[in-house]
Amino acid sequence: MEKTQKIKIGATGWVMIAISIMILFTCGFLTALVGIDYGPHEQIALSLTPGDPVGLFKAHPEPFWHLLTYGVVKLLHCRVEIAAGIVSGLLIVLTYVIAFVTIRNTVPGLEGHEVAGLDLVLHLVSAIYVPFFNKEPFLGQGTPNIWHNPTTIAVRPIALLIFALVASMVIRMRKEEFETNIPVGKAIAAGLLLILSCLAKPSFVQVFYPAIFTLMVIWLIMFKGKNLRNAIQLMLMCLPSLAVMILQFVIAFYSGHSNSGGITIAPFAVAGARTPSIAISMMLLLAFPLLMVILTAIRKELTWGDALAWLMLLWGTIWRLLLAEKGERMYHGNFTWGYMLAVYLVWYTAVRSYLKLYFSEQMTGNKRGVGFVLATAVLVLHLVSGLYYLIYLVVLGHGM
């Protein structure tokens, strides 16, 4: 993505950033105290043996969040529940900051408070809640903002960094007609981040690898092999993290260290277990991104970076619909996490497009028509639903 001249953030922007950080940290901290997934992960954090990294990895092959929590417990001498809330709250704030910086770097002419405000909305929205369709706001629907699962919270800022970095590579490749190599520094950074994402939760690479592969195959066909060199470079960038993911897969499913019975193909069994209609649930989750991709396509503003996000969503949907764990863990939905991360990235591109079309220097107030009104109305529905989801978790005591 090309860097553009940015407007200074200004006092209003900094105030909005500060308010957003306080809101998101508080939400992350409070939901950590009630989230049902936290208990087992907190016990793992307390049981870690950092002095034996090999044994630690064999016992817990995705230890990133647990190591952070362990470190906070030792540093602050606090209860593990407090440490968990601090770590998750800070990770959510980090995701917000990364989104803010990357949006400002890629969309010209945005005021700081505009980006800060819409960035906050991005990190509060959920699927549109329709009680008579599905009584629970998350189960069966999904959300771009997972509050109750610490490892998903841990991998999300890493996933966003990788996406922003690789999307910039993809756009540059196409712009330069595949005549130049991927910058070595960017490739190394992305490769290291991919390894870190596996150590946080391998769900992201499960959608990233097939998406980038699919894009390269599409380009090989469209451009008659011109992108082959860049495709090989991307493959080499992914190999170290792929090795880590394979090792994690073997430990998780076939080493006897877990209670998983392996993987099975179970079409629609898990995805359809808690919803009357998978298709309607997806529409309620993706109404705003779908509308924005249509509006952006009409304006001819779609980028190959946007396409990469939607390809990740495609593969996330495939894994979610088809795969499950055998035995008692079948309905844990562990092949849904990659889908949720892809949903977040599609939402990120949608909010960025919304800012670009209706708030950047390219647009003025008198150019906001029916599309703006409709998109804003749908976004408000998602926001209200997201706020209710937080109330459902924290105030009503449904920690999922």
How does the language model describe each region?
Residues 115-170, 278-281, 333-343:
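Membrane-interface micro-motifs in multi-pass membrane enzymes
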Residues 186-202, 208:
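Membrane-interface alpha helices of multi-pass inner-membrane proteins
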Residues 1-26, 111-120:
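Start-transfer (signal-anchor) and selected internal transmembrane alpha helices
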Residues 206, 328-356:
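Hydrophobic/aromatic-rich transmembrane helices and adjacent perimembrane loops
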Residues 31-40, 47-50, 61-63, 202-207, ...:
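Transmembrane catalytic cores of multi-pass membrane glycosyltransferases
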Residues 83-112, 161:
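Transmembrane-helix motifs of polytopic, lipid-linked glycan transferases
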Residues 10-14, 112-119, 182-186, 229-238, ...:
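Membrane-interfacial loop-to-transmembrane alpha-helix junctions, especially the N-terminal start
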Residues 40-47, 53-82:
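Short hydrophobic/aromatic helix or loop-helix immediately within or flanking a transmembrane segment
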